[in-house]
């Protein structure tokens, strides 16, 4: 519905706009951490620039709705004081104790991926959703809850979740986002099932089918070229 904002013709691919190829060194998916912790660990490994006040308000609401839950925030500069203090101030205003928040900075990529074995549910920021971050969480067996908007940047996770076959994790708005997260946090059987099945499901999905993506993309590019050569409008 955003075609009117583009000066060029928008061409939509049938599945997604990227193909994800997981790194060979990605750790094995671990058991659901809830079973060893006895509480839910939420996580977001997104750029702190994406985590605005509205996002923090919603996440604070979630933490207050899921007793004893924690939130692990990780990014290369997430442990910088200016980022930590901004988030702590907002979350504290909602009654979230600082002890429930963990801020982690830069690490090797393999260690970042391994950290997902301590996360039960990943929280997607909005209106700028995760892209590669969402793919990595899913590959590590961690479900991601997202709320898409109208812009391309706000619909990355929507695309990935749809292509993997779990559109039920896509919320219709902030309130529905909270409801979906809280509901999933209280459904340990569902979380356990996702943990054990998500990587295989993703591996077999359109999101990880590089050959199909390459075939579709090159076909579209050839069609664009042929249309240009014939002086036709690209469709």
Residue ranges and their predicted role:
Residues 117, 125-210:
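Catalytic binding pocket for nucleotide-activated donors in carbohydrate/polymer assembly enzymes
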Residues 1-58, 200, 204-208, 213-235:
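Glycine-rich phosphate/pyrophosphate-binding loop
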Residues 45-48, 61-64, 68, 73-94, ...:
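C-terminal amphipathic helix plus adjacent low-complexity
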Residues 10, 100-101, 167-168:
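Short, conserved active-site loop motifs that form the nucleotide-linked donor/cofactor pocket
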Residues 34-57, 76-135:
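Donor nucleotide-activated moiety binding/catalytic core segment of transferases
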Residues 13, 104, 171:
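Hydrophobic residues at beta-strand termini and immediately following loops
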Residues 39-41, 70, 143:
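Residues that mark the start of a beta-strand
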């Amino acid at each position: 519905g955003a075609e009117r904002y583009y000066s060029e013709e928008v061409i939509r691919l049938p599945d997604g706009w990227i193909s994800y190829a997981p790194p060979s060194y990605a750790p094995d998916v671990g058991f659901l951490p809830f079973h060893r912790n006895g509480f839910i660990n939420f996580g977001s490994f997104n750029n702190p620039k994406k985590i605005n006040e509205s996002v923090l308000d919603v996440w604070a609401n979630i933490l207050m709705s899921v007793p004893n839950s924690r939130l692990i925030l990780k990014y290369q500069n997430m442990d910088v004081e200016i980022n930590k203090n901004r988030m702590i101030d907002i979350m504290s205003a909602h009654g979230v104790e600082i002890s429930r928040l963990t801020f982690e900075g830069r690490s090797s990529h393999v260690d970042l991926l391994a950290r997902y074995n301590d996360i039960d549910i990943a929280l997607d920021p909005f209106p700028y959703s995760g892209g590669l971050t969402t793919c990595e969480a899913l590959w590590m067996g961690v479900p991601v809850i997202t709320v898409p908007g109208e812009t391309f940047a706000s619909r990355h996770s929507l695309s990935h979740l749809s292509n993997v076959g779990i559109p039920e994790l896509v919320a219709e708005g902030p309130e529905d986002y909270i409801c979906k997260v809280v509901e999933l946090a209280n459904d340990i059987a569902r979380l356990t099932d996702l943990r054990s099945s998500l990587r295989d499901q993703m591996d077999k999905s359109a999101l990880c089918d590089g050959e199909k993506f390459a075939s579709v993309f090159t076909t579209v590019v050839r069609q664009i070229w042929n249309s240009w050569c014939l002086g036709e409008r690209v469709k």
